[in-house]
Amino acid sequence: MPIDSSPLPCSVLLLSGGRGQRMGGQDKGLLEWRGQPLIAHLQRLARPLTDDLIISCNRNPERYADYADQLVNDDSPDFPGPLAGIRAGLAAARHEHLLILPCDVPHIDAPLLADLRETARRNLLLPVMVRHGEFWEPLICIIPTRLRAAVEDAWHAGERSPRKIFLQLGGVGLECPADDPRLANLNTPQLLQTPSGVSE
């Protein structure tokens, strides 16, 4: 029987529901970088990968609607962190795997996502996270939606760290270079204003 080498079908969740503290409380996904909102850069990358593009947003749904097939929001009003958006995405996802990306990593490219999907295809029952050096990136990951109940259990037990939960569930790492520029977070006004979007 031939080995299936087709890309892993995924729903995609773009996380844009945070408080934006480092941005002065602004809605980070709508801030402009290179002439477009951050969310537009991620949407353009993710759109070819799925027929189920979900955006987690807690503000301005009318501005996000054109970028998504579904919008979700947290079930708590106090910006409880990215795990709340992940929970909402897992509940809404139409495929058996959910690829998760934060809105502030516009340097992410298609080859990295292809590697992530291939690693997930080889580890169908486990969360797969990007890892660079000693650091895990739990918000750049693919998680089987069948793990939703385990994530819910951890949430109700008080855990709020996606990294801890995914590692407890047997998380696998996609190794990237320690200084991989594709993983740069544009999470301050200064980084948004630099030409490269990478700190000097």
Swiss-Prot record:
InterPro entries: MobA-like_NTP_Trfase (IPR025877), Molybde_CF_guanTrfase (IPR013482), Nucleotide-diphossugar_trans (IPR029044). It is found in: Cytoplasm. It is an enzyme of class 2 (transferase). Keywords: Cytoplasm, GTP-binding, Magnesium, Metal-binding, Molybdenum cofactor biosynthesis, Nucleotide-binding, Transferase. GTP binds at residues 15-17, 28, 74, 104. Its EC number is 2.7.7.77. Its cofactor is Mg(2+). Its main location: cytoplasm. It holds the Pfam family NTP_transf_3. It comes from the Bacteria. The gene is mobA. HAMAP family: MobA (MF_00316). The lineage of its organism: Bacteria, Pseudomonadati, Pseudomonadota, Gammaproteobacteria, Pseudomonadales. GO terms for biological process: bis(molybdopterin guanine dinucleotide)molybdenum biosynthetic process. The keyword Cytoplasm applies. This is Molybdenum cofactor guanylyltransferase. Belongs to the MobA family. One of its GO terms (cellular component) is cytoplasm. It catalyses: Mo-molybdopterin + GTP + H(+) = Mo-molybdopterin guanine dinucleotide + diphosphate. GO terms for molecular function: GTP binding; metal ion binding; molybdenum cofactor guanylyltransferase activity. The N-terminal domain determines nucleotide recognition and specific binding, while the C-terminal domain determines the specific binding to the target protein. Mg(2+) binds at residue 104. Monomer. Transfers a GMP moiety from GTP to Mo-molybdopterin (Mo-MPT) cofactor (Moco or molybdenum cofactor) to form Mo-molybdopterin guanine dinucleotide (Mo-MGD) cofactor.
